[in-house]
Amino acid sequence: MGFFSIDATDLKWVNGDKDDIEDLCLHGHAIAYIGEHKLEYEDATISATALYLLKTLTEDHIIDTDNQMLPCCGFNIYPHPDDSLDNVIILGCPNGIDWTVLHDGNTVILELDDGTREYIPLDDYKREVFRFADKIEMFYKSCTAKKLPEDDELTCNGYIAFWNEWHRRRNQ
């Protein structure tokens, strides 16, 4: 079976600080290994990466059809219009690093843009995604509680939906 790992270093808010009460999106240096391939993005939106990975525990992700797995930006977070703060839509720019995630029974298939495929046991993939997501959530918890924008209900509800979706997916 194949190999997958992901980590983030130099966690910070967009202004470069280790704490920012108003910044909702965590950034950092993302490094993923898919087999022997190292994928690295110096200033990824790490909070979005973690949520996207949690989504891939139950959903396929096709390269270049949605947000990147290691996105540059996640500057807009909105609650999904079809639910009541249960899911979030994160919009960003087209820059970042992406790969495909497919499910075949108890195997996750990670496919790079060059066609390289790694086959990961679902339990191993899930453990790695949970480890990464838990690290990111711990960073949020180590910071001052966020001050949500009082004059922007859409962003406020988007942030609430972000964590609702995160916790639902993390606990399933």
Where are these regions (language model features)?
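Mixed-charge, glycine-accented linear interaction segment located at domain edges/termini
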Residues: D104-Q172
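N-terminal low-complexity, intrinsically disordered segments
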Residues: M1-S84, C93-N95, W99, H103
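Short glycine-rich, low-complexity/disordered patches
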Residues: I62-L85, L91, M138-F162
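Short, flexible coil/linker segments at or flanking structured domains
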Residues: D20, Y41, N87-I89, D113, ...
